[in-house]
From Swiss-Prot:
It catalyses: GTP + H2O = GDP + phosphate + H(+). Heterotrimeric G proteins are composed of 3 units; alpha, beta and gamma. Part of a spindle orientation complex at least composed of GNAI1, GPSM2 and NUMA1. The alpha chain contains the guanine nucleotide binding site. Identified in complex with the beta subunit GNB1 and the gamma subunit GNG1. Identified in complex with the beta subunit GNB1 and the gamma subunit GNG2. Component of the TAS2R14-GNAI1 complex, consisting of TAS2R14, GNAI1, GNB1 and GNG2; within the complex interacts with TAS2R14; this complex plays a role in the perception of bitterness. (Microbial infection) Interacts with human cytomegalovirus (HHV-5) US27; this interaction this interaction does not lead to the catalytic activation of Gi complex and probably interferes with the chemokine-Gi signaling. A lipid is attached at C3 (S-palmitoyl cysteine). GO terms for cellular component: cell cortex; centriolar satellite; centrosome; ciliary basal body; cytoplasm; cytosol; extracellular exosome; Golgi apparatus. One of its GO terms (biological process) is response to prostaglandin E. Belongs to the G-alpha family. G(i/o/t/z) subfamily. This is Guanine nucleotide-binding protein G(i) subunit alpha-1. A lipid is attached at G2 (N-myristoyl glycine). One of its GO terms (molecular function) is adenylate cyclase inhibitor activity. It comes from the Eukaryota. Residues 196-205 are annotated as: G3 motif.
Length: 354
């Protein structure tokens, strides 16, 4: 008889080898697939991070795609100046030049009649005159007392360019656009031989119940916090300080039993706005017990500690914190490179190779 295998046995061995090979390949493929969940309160910069991934890893926005953002740029610009004018009434701030009151009335008429994606020379002129007014500027400087888009000054200062008839938004203009995210936006890209799937989840509280089914098997959570929110209240709740809301949400995510083995990456975002704001608005508005100086370094480090201290499993769970400016492509590229290295290291650990 000897040890020769029958044709049937040989086929079984081949089948077994093939199954092993497929399992190995599936395992390697799974190890290369990274699911990232972007979480954070509303307007913390999640969608801007997603846009940066497209710019950094997918050759950015085509001219055609940029053109599609023209209507959003105009809408954001008009809504910003309207928000400031409305706030002037509430805050009892007068126009520096009384002639601007006519421009304000004209603004509401022209904005109401404006065709989507177009800005007439007349409307642009009205907005420009209003924006230059000392009373409007005084109201803008008190924007923490009402809801105003972060991109307001960016667009209003550049009105000459964006009001041109042949205007096409730049990548930076697109990054600065603000559209409330509803539902879940999924983005795919490849970087350092890893296949990323990034999920951007609607930040406002009414949207949070939609997150839950995204959570299973995520590699890491990127949690965005707007540092500059320390002196603001929520859009959905005029009583709740935005930073406190962020901390509450971070606590519930960081210490959630589902995420015991999930890497948590904390993006303390809008560091550029925070650096400007901390010179004028003390940190004690948010943290009355804070006794440090109102310098960027000391105040930012204090906020970092406030979030990291919420981690109840410090011995087994590490929080990877980065200070970011989501509208700065170079900064996001640098930070995301570091984040990817952490993910690779943790993946190797999970496979027993590190």
């Amino acid at each position: 008889m000897g040890c020769t295998l029958s044709a049937e046995d040989k086929a079984a061995v081949e089948r077994s080898k093939m199954i092993d090979r497929n399992l190995r390949e599936d395992g390697e493929k799974a190890a290369r697939e990274v699911k990232l969940l972007l979480l954070g309160a509303g307007e913390s910069g999640k969608s801007t991070i997603v846009k940066q991934m497209k710019i950094i890893h997918e050759a950015g926005y085509s001219e055609e795609e940029c053109k599609q953002y023209k209507a959003v740029v105009y809408s954001n610009t008009i809504q910003s100046i309207i928000a400031i004018i409305r706030a002037m009434g509430r805050l009892k701030i007068d126009f520096g030049d009384s002639a601007r009151a006519d421009d304000a009335r004209q603004l509401f008429v022209l904005a109401g009649a404006a065709e989507e994606g177009f800005m007439t020379a007349e409307l642009a002129g009205v907005i420009k005159r209003l924006w230059k007014d000392s009373g409007v500027q005084a109201c803008f400087n008190r924007s923490r007392e009402y809801q105003l888009n972060d991109s307001a000054a960016y667009y209003l200062n550049d009105l000459d360019r964006i009001a041109q008839p042949n205007y096409i938004p730049t990548q930076q203009d697109v990054l600065r656009t603000r559209v409330k995210t509803t539902g879940i936006v999924e983005t795919h890209f490849t970087f350092k031989d890893l296949h990323f799937k990034m999920f951007d989840v609607g930040g406002q509280r009414s949207e949070r119940k939609k997150w839950i089914h995204c959570f299973e098997g995520v590699t890491a959570i990127i949690f965005c916090v707007a540092l500059s929110d320390y002196d603001l209240v929520l859009a959905e709740d005029e009583e709740m300080n935005r930073m406190h809301e962020s901390m509450k949400l971070f606590d519930s995510i960081c210490n959630n039993k589902w995420f015991t083995d999930t890497s948590i990456i904390l993006f303390l975002n809008k560091k550029d706005l925070f650096e400007e704001k901390i010179k004028k608005s003390p940190l004690t508005i948010c943290y009355p017990e804070y006794a440090g100086s109102n310098t960027y370094e000391e105040a930012a480090a204090y906020i970092q500690c406030q979030f990291e201290d919420l981690n109840k499993r410090k011995d087994t769970k590490e929080i990877y914190t980065h200070f970011t400016c989501a509208t700065d492509t170079k900064n996001v590229q640098f930070v995301f490179d570091a984040v990817t290295d952490v993910i690779i290291k943790n993946n190797l650990k999970d496979c027993g190779l590190f």
